[in-house]
């Protein structure tokens, strides 16, 4: 099988098998640690930008994003474009927080 035909999932599965068999090298460990740390840092940076955007909406409308999102989900807000954008940002931030929890082993924000 050519390297280009091997999917990322297959390559990760191969690494998992090597780890399970105790055949992982220190280089593999260091590389994976660096990769996870890099991905976590990228997620933190993206979350920081989103949190600044959320803070603008919170200041503009005098409401915490969590409270807004509960009301939005319950249909207690109108359909103005600001609210649609705010809701999307809340969802994006939640996904990034979940990603961080996975990347850092459950100790994310």
Which role fits each region the language model picked out?
Residues 35, 71-85:
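Short His/Asp/Glu-rich catalytic/ion-coordination signatures at enzyme active sites or charged loops
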Residues 55-77:
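Short E/K-rich amphipathic alpha-helical oligomerization segments
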Residues 71, 92-94, 109:
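Short, surface-exposed linear patches
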Residues 1-59, 63, 98-109:
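Small, basic N-terminal interaction modules of short regulatory proteins
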């Amino acid at each position: 099988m050519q390297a280009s035909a091997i999917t990322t999932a297959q390559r990760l599965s191969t690494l998992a098998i090597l780890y399970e068999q105790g055949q992982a090298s220190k280089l593999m460990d260091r590389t994976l640690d660096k990769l996870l740390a890099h991905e976590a840092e990228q997620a933190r940076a993206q979350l920081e930008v989103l949190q600044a955007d959320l803070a603008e909406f919170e200041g503009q409308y005098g409401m915490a994003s969590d409270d807004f999102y509960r009301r939005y989900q319950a249909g207690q807000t109108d359909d103005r474009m600001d609210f649609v954008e705010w809701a999307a940002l809340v969802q994006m931030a939640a996904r990034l927080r979940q990603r961080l929890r996975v990347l850092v082993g459950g100790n994310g924000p």
